[in-house]
């Protein structure tokens, strides 16, 4: 009688991705309330740093409204090519664990971890290892990983 293989899937989500990249690339922005976005007064917030979220600012909010909530916010333009570059680095890390990776967006991916326990140990340990490796190869960016 064969034992049925436990299916495991990981949802990897980069934390405040655009804003975190801007703070990493521009140390003077670290610890400051950063809005990544553009489009003038009718533009929207593409990303909000953790420092600005405490003012009630969040992604998809009109920039004008965000600046009312936090007048001292620092607005930086979107650099999609840079975010895509970092995203590729993260996906490379995930693919070093499994060929079954599905990119959901520039800052999210799904990894099929079914059967990988034989190679990497318990999936919880594997998730912690991935988080450490992502942080290392990106120069300090963090991610959250959900398991199902």
Residue spans of the language-model regions?
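Gly/Gly-Pro- and Ser/Thr-rich, intrinsically disordered tail segments characteristic of DNA damage-repair
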Residues: 1-148
């Amino acid at each position: 009688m064969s034992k049925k293989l436990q299916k495991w899937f990981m949802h990897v989500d980069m934390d405040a991705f655009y804003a975190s990249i801007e703070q990493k690339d521009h140390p003077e922005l670290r610890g400051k309330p950063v809005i990544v976005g553009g489009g003038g007064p009718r533009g929207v917030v593409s990303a909000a740093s953790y420092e600005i979220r405490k003012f009630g600012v969040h992604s998809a909010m009109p920039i004008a409204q965000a600046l009312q909530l936090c007048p001292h916010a620092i607005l930086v333009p979107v650099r999609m090519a840079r975010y895509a570059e970092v995203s590729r680095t993260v996906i490379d890390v995930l693919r070093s664990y499994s060929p079954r990776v599905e990119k959901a967006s520039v800052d999210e991916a799904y990894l099929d971890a079914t059967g990988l326990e034989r190679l990497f140990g318990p999936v919880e340990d594997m998730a912690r290892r991935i988080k450490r490796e992502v942080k290392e190869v990106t120069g300090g960016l963090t991610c959250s990983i959900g398991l199902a």
